[in-house]
């Protein structure tokens, strides 16, 4: 049978989700835990591949296994006891045999957190930026993103990508006492896309670029035309949605 694992992780201590030959990844740690508990190799296929230092409040991965009578009900508890403190399992859901954690996802939502003050407790969970930002201009620019579908200008260079088309359905900045949060939802994202978008919008907020410039940047399809890529530690994958009919 096929199952979806729902889980969270702090990405600080990991070189991203995907297994790496000479570095520790979230996938490696979770697969090792599953193999130890279930006494057989359990390959995981996740909804996406977060980069080094990126966090996930909600992530899904699918796997196949024929559970014994009492194994399934205990697995979430056992995994949480076995895994390190920075990975937490939330649920185990039975899905249809063809359900795919990556390809069946309808949407993904990311948040990027910027702090306007120094904090010794949260420096691995946000990007520190003390300059004042023009949020009104940044939100005008965020709306521009939803007018386009080709985001090659925000894609990491020299990556094997079949299509640069993404449908962004929400993009907005909010302000709090602690700083700024950017929330963006799309059906899919390119590698490094959110961090490049945030860096570009920050440059607009600092008046280094204009909202009108953003149209030209997107139309150029040139990564060097866009802004800088902000650091990974402020980025969180926060929500993934699936068709209800996948779940049994």
Model features per residue range: what roles?
Residues 1-248:
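Structured-RNA-binding interfaces characteristic of tRNA pseudouridine synthases
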């Amino acid at each position: 049978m096929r199952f979806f694992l729902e889980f969270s992780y702090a990405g600080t201590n990991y070189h991203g989700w995907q297994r790496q030959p000479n570095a520790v990844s979230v996938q490696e740690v979770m697969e090792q835990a599953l193999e130890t508990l279930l006494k057989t190799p359990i390959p995981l296929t996740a909804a996406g591949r977060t980069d080094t230092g990126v966090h996930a409040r909600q992530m899904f991965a699918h796997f196949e296994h024929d559970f014994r009578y009492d194994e399934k009900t205990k697995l979430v508890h056992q995994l949480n006891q076995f895994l390190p403190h920075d990975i937490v399992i939330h649920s185990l859901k039975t899905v249809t045999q063809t359900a795919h954690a990556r390809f069946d996802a309808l949407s993904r939502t990311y948040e990027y957190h910027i702090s306007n003050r120094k904090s010794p407790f949260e420096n691995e969970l946000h990007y520190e930026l003390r300059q004042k930002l023009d949020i009104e201009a940044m939100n005008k620019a965020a709306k521009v993103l939803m007018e386009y579908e080709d985001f090659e200008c925000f894609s990491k260079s020299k990556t094997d990508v079949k299509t640069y088309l993404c449908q962004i359905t929400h993009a907005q900045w909010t302000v709090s006492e602690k700083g700024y949060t950017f929330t963006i939802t799309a059906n899919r994202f390119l590698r490094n896309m959110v961090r490049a978008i945030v860096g570009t919008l920050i440059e607009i907020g600092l008046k280094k670029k204009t909202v009108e410039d953003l149209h030209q940047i997107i139309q150029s399809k040139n990564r060097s035309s866009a802004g800088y890529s902000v650091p990974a530690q402020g980025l969180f994958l926060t929500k993934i949605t699936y068709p209800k009919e996948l779940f049994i």
